[in-house]
Curated annotation (Swiss-Prot):
It holds the Pfam family Rib_5-P_isom_A. Catalyzes the reversible conversion of ribose-5-phosphate to ribulose 5-phosphate. Transmembrane segments: none annotated. One of its GO terms (biological process) is pentose-phosphate shunt, non-oxidative branch. GO terms for molecular function: ribose-5-phosphate isomerase activity. It catalyses: aldehydo-D-ribose 5-phosphate = D-ribulose 5-phosphate. Belongs to the ribose 5-phosphate isomerase family. Homodimer. Pathway: Carbohydrate degradation; pentose phosphate pathway; D-ribose 5-phosphate from D-ribulose 5-phosphate (non-oxidative stage): step 1/1. This is Ribose-5-phosphate isomerase A.
Length: 242
């Protein structure tokens, strides 16, 4: 069983880079915007920075959170949230990613919120993905590929995945219990294969399996902002070798 990733935040040596990325991104927010809030450690810093602007500048916005954790944090820092069931166009979505390849294709879902994160990205007029340099990979698959799977018939879905060559583990909480997403589903973390040269093909193949809700591949129009250890930030908008 794979364990749900733990939050390290300030113990991460790249924490200052994440904060800098968040501050750069929060400057994009303008009055009246609807802002999509991602999940994960870098998105957390963005939410904190946005909450600070709401408090100190009396910035009038609305926001939609991609996870229960992000929702609770947004509420705690005073960011007004809109009804996610009424979600339509989102002016700006800010999120992170687990891996990014040279074509800006990504893997998301390390925090277990991949389905909602992808809905936000689909709705975003402008999508900004914040990552540090460790997330840049030549080919996707360095870590694992999260797949969200409905509980009903999940063992059958796993059998089909294995038959097609996708092997992994069901994600667990730190208490050793099956991890459950905000949508009430499970996460199967695929370890093998460990590289995806053509993730579009794998995504199509996987989404044809009944019971799979979504796959961690993100192939969408987005800007990727990369923070480096030397303090620099590089903004990528299209195919661009590292």
């Amino acid at each position: 069983m794979s364990k749900q990733p733990e939050n390290s935040f300030s113990s991460d040596k790249f924490f200052p880079i994440k904060q800098k990325l968040a501050l750069e991104a929060v400057a994009l927010v303008e009055p009246g915007m609807c802002v999509g809030l991602g999940s994960g450690s870098t998105a957390r810093e963005f939410i904190l920075a946005l909450g600070d602007r709401v408090r100190t500048e009396r910035l009038v916005i609305t926001a939609v959170a991609s996870s229960r954790i992000s929702q609770l944090l947004a509420e705690a820092v005073g960011i007004p949230l809109s009804d996610h069931s009424l979600l339509q166009d989102v002016d700006l979505v800010v999120d992170g990613a687990d891996e990014v390849d040279p074509c800006l294709r990504m893997i998301k879902g390390g925090g277990g919120a991949l389905f909602r994160e992808k809905i936000l990205l689909q709705s975003g007029k402008r999508n900004v993905i914040l990552v540090d340099e460790r997330k840049l990979v030549p080919t996707l698959g360095k870590f694992s590929l999260p797949i969200e799977i409905a509980p009903f018939g999940c063992s059958s879905v796993q059998r089909i995945l294995n038959k097609q060559g996708y092997f992994g583990e069901w994600r667990e909480t730190s208490a050793g219990e099956r991890f459950i997403t905000d949508n009430g589903n499970y996460i199967y973390d695929v370890r093998t294969p460990d590289s995806y040269a053509n993730p579009e093909e794998d995504m199509i193949r996987l989404l044809q399996i009944r019971g799979i809700i979504d796959v961690g591949f993100v192939i969408a129009k987005a800007e990727v902002w990369v923070g480096y250890a030397d303090g620099s930030i590089v903004r990528k908008k299209e195919h661009n070798e590292y």
